[in-house]
Amino acid sequence: MDSAITLWQFLLQLLQKPQNKHMICWTSNDGQFKLLQAEEVARLWGIRKNKPNMNYDKLSRALRYYYVKNIIKKVNGQKFVYKFVSYPEILNMDPMTVGRIEGDCESLNFSEVSSSSKDVENGGKDKPPQPGAKTSSRNDYIHSGLYSSFTLNSLNSSNVKLFKLIKTENPAEKLAEKKSPQEPTPSVIKFVTTPSKKPPVEPVAATISIGPSISPSSEETIQALETLVSPKLPSLEAPTSASNVMTAFATTPPISSIPPLQEPPRTPSPPLSSHPDIDTDIDSVASQPMELPENLSLEPKDQDSVLLEKDKVNNSSRSKKPKGLELAPTLVITSSDPSPLGILSPSLPTASLTPAFFSQTPIILTPSPLLSSIHFWSTLSPVAPLSPARLQGANTLFQFPSVLNSHGPFTLSGLDGPSTPGPFSPDLQKT
């Protein structure tokens, strides 16, 4: 037997032999046949092709190859029933001609084969069997190369992909547009706490409003202070006219609250000791807000101290420390007459226990929670009355650490109390 025979030729030979009617037979006159023993037919086909493992599943897959070539097609709704499309012309056709047609079809792609087979099956379902002339013309048109279902499917699939790409690009652009206006918003910074830093303006305005009550001898000094402080007013407060400031503070009582101010520097001089009223007023300023009666007149010698006080107010406004931690600078007393006590050292002579004597110690004027946690351990020392510095006099080289040598706050009396500051240590209380 010829091993080069094709499957459709093998089936046609079996149908033409009457001894094979128990395996395969014709069911109609239009080329329809049925495999009565499909497994036996498959076994014979395996023997012909030298494939002992051949079965009906492999045979049916091989028959699908001829669906594309429009040689054999499956009859729908009937099992093991097939039909020759060009029957009875195929009986008279030269096998070489059919082989050449098969060779032309083998050049097609496998994907075209599968898609065309589906089209043929669907066409068989919808349409009844056509006459042989129309079938042959349709077969020639398909194999002419002008028609290809594969190209149509590829074009349709490419269009779908293009639309999908466009759809995926649009959401990305929308997300980018939504994110772009939202990016600059976190960089906005609101400075809300800046208007609260205005305390240094009040003492300046208060000083200007009290000006008419001071004697004419100190008017020049106050004018000099106004020129020093006036450049700082625009940066601390919103622009207001000077007349509004004067009228706002003119109606208030002479008492004006001053944020943490240092004690005004003073030098011990005879006018301070000879005028106890002035000393009392200056000491009350250190412990309470500054109070200047209308009948108070400053002497020309105190004008220098007022200038130094205003300069230090300006310096304190520039400092960045909290209000509770601002300390007054330490002052050095330049007194010519030595003190008989000589508590500190020979290099620091002190005249008396006047308020100028206590101005060497830094003073915290504002109430602060730090005061309760600061202790003067030197004031609690019971050895202070028996110190060698007290017993040996002022010319000794031994220096005992006293409270005047330390830095810390001390309490001052109010306006109604005594004008002298409170005691520091047992030494000062006895003196």
From Swiss-Prot:
Region (Disordered): 114-139, 251-282, 294-323, 411-431
GO terms, biological process: cell differentiation; negative regulation of transcription by RNA polymerase II; positive regulation of transcription by RNA polymerase II; regulation of transcription by RNA polymerase II
Coiled-coil stretches: none
SUPFAM superfamilies from the UniProt entry: Winged helix' DNA-binding domain
Covalent crosslink: Glycyl lysine isopeptide (Lys-Gly) (interchain with G-Cter in SUMO2): K167
Any Pfam family: Ets
Compartments in which it is found: Nucleus
Transmembrane segments: none
Keyword terms, alphabetized: Activator, DNA-binding, Isopeptide bond, Nucleus, Phosphoprotein, Repressor, Transcription, Transcription regulation, Ubl conjugation
DNA-binding region listed in the record: 5-85
Pro residues composition-biased segments: 261-273
Any single Gene Ontology cellular-component annotation: cytosol
Bias (Basic and acidic residues): 118-128, 299-313
Single GO MF annotation: RNA polymerase II cis-regulatory region sequence-specific DNA binding
Residues recorded as bearing Phosphoserine in the entry: S180
Family indicated by similarity: Belongs to the ETS family.
PANTHER family from the UniProt entry: ETS, ETS DOMAIN-CONTAINING PROTEIN ELK-4
Subunit structure and binding partners: Interacts with SIRT7.
Described function: Involved in both transcriptional activation and repression. Interaction with SIRT7 leads to recruitment and stabilization of SIRT7 at promoters, followed by deacetylation of histone H3 at 'Lys-18' (H3K18Ac) and subsequent transcription repression. Forms a ternary complex with the serum response factor (SRF). Requires DNA-bound SRF for ternary complex formation and makes extensive DNA contacts to the 5'side of SRF, but does not bind DNA autonomously.
Listed name of the protein: ETS domain-containing protein Elk-4
Organism whose genome encodes this protein: Homo sapiens (Human)
